[in-house]
């Protein structure tokens, strides 16, 4: 993956392409976040723009690019890794959380002139984070503006979005109908009549569907709109391939609208509705859509699915315990095999051990995928908390 991102052009060339775009738009700076339109913790390749720009492969970071400077913030898990990967790139490492190091908002306010214009992709920043920048900027007359097309203009050879098929999650302990009943009750309690979800794990939980659009995360790229009358899933129709999925959607009265048509449909469908939106879990572009192109009234509040899916019933708790037992057994088998190899004088590599561990887990009943790539490190590599 890293080679795919980095071989065609240098970091300097990629940054210059972005600077050309910044200049064309009349901006003083550009903000890059490590996020996708669903604000996922782990990203599909299509949305790894920060990695493409910088060569930094950690899972968390943000960048600020001006006409003559480029800075990257990341937390202490990645300081050593970032220092290695940014060396010689001209990108300054900002150790987020270290004493005396300003965050991106503070740095922009301290280093840009009054009335400066800053741009970002509104799809990859939450509404609450966007507001925090606006509040900080307002004291100096600065403005943050969203531009959706910049990433495509700058990122040559950008990977296409994944079109992996969706499947029905059959090991569920609660029906879609029962979950929808709970969600609608919570939505009404919040003073709304509709709920728009963008967080992929919440959508997978509520629909009892799974996907594989993000490595180590069984989710699928989508939005979900729940009203008192209907449920609409915004997803690429090519992902719906099997009779089981089609039957599941029909049985649960879930309508499908193409992901590419979501903006127009959401704006029209929510006219006159009171829609509950979680400003920490919905991107700024969604908020702007409803405020500017729909007569919907936005009710700000936490999405009820976050709490509901965290409450496990007895059957689900037993499944969690069984998962831990199976994983523990896989680890025991792995360590036993490792002891045998070392006793026989074999010296496996980090990659070989990661593959061995995966293989032991994959043998277990009900295995779907790893929750994250195994972190196996020897020597100096062991100093990197998220080494891969």
Regions found by a protein language model. Give the residues of each.
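N-terminal accessory/capping or targeting/presequence segment of soluble
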Residues: 2-113, 125, 129-269, 330, ...
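Conserved short loop/turn motifs at secondary-structure junctions
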Residues: 3-8, 119-126, 171-172, 202, ...
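Generic, well-ordered alpha-helical scaffold segments in large soluble proteins
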Residues: 18-21, 111, 136, 186, ...
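Amphipathic alpha-helical
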Residues: 24, 28-32, 350-372
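Hydrophobic/aromatic-rich, well-ordered segments within soluble, folded domains that form packed cores
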Residues: 56, 65, 313-324
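Conserved catalytic alpha/beta cores of large enzymes that bind or transform nucleotide phosphates
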Residues: 108-109, 116, 120, 244-311, ...
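Terminal amphipathic helices with adjacent charged low-complexity linkers/tails
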Residues: 132-157, 283-319
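Active-site-proximal beta-alpha loop/turn segments in soluble metabolic enzymes
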Residues: 160-169, 312-316, 336-346, 383
């Amino acid at each position: 993956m890293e080679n795919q991102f980095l071989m065609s052009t240098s970091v300097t060339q990629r940054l210059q392409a972005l600077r050309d775009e910044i200049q064309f738009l009349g901006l003083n700076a550009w903000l890059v976040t490590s996020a996708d339109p669903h604000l996922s913790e782990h990203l599909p390749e299509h949305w790894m723009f920060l990695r493409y720009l910088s060569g930094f492969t950690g899972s968390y970071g943000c960048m600020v690019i001006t006409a003559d400077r480029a800075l990257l913030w990341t937390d202490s898990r990645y300081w050593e890794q970032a220092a290695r990967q940014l060396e010689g790139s001209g990108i300054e490492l900002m150790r987020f959380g270290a004493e005396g190091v300003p965050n991106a908002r503070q740095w922009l306010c301290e280093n840009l002139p009054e009335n400066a214009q800053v741009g970002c992709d509104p799809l990859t920043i939450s509404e609450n984070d966007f507001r925090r920048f606006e509040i900080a900027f307002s004291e100096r007359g600065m403005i943050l503006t969203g531009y959706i097309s910049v990433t495509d203009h700058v990122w040559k050879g950008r990977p296409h979005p994944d079109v992996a098929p969706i499947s029905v999650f059959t090991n569920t302990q609660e029906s879609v109908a029962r979950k929808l009943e709970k969600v609608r009750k919570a939505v009404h309690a919040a003073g709304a009549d509709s709920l728009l979800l963008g967080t992929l794990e919440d959508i997978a939980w509520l629909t009892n569907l799974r996907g594989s659009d993000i490595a180590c995360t069984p989710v699928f790229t989508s939005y979900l709109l729940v009203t008192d009358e209907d449920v609409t899933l915004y997803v690429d129709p090519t992902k719906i391939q099997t009779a089981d999925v089609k039957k599941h959607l029909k049985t649960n009265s879930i309508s499908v609208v193409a992901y590419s048509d979501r903006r127009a449909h959401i704006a029209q469908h929510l006219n006159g509705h009171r829609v509950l939106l979680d400003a920490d879990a919905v991107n700024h572009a969604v908020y702007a859509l409803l405020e500017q192109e729909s007569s919907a009234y936005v009710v700000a509040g936490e999405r009820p699915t976050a709490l509901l899916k965290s409450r496990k019933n007895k059957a689900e708790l037993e499944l969690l315990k069984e998962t831990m037992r199976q994983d523990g057994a896989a680890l025991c088998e792995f360590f036993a095999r490792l002891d045998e190899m070392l006793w026989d004088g074999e010296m496996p590599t980090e990659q070989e051990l990661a593959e061995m561990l995966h293989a032991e887990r994959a043998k277990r009943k009900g295995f779907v995928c790893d929750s994250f790539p195994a972190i196996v490190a020897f020597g100096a590599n062991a100093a990197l908390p998220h080494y891969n």
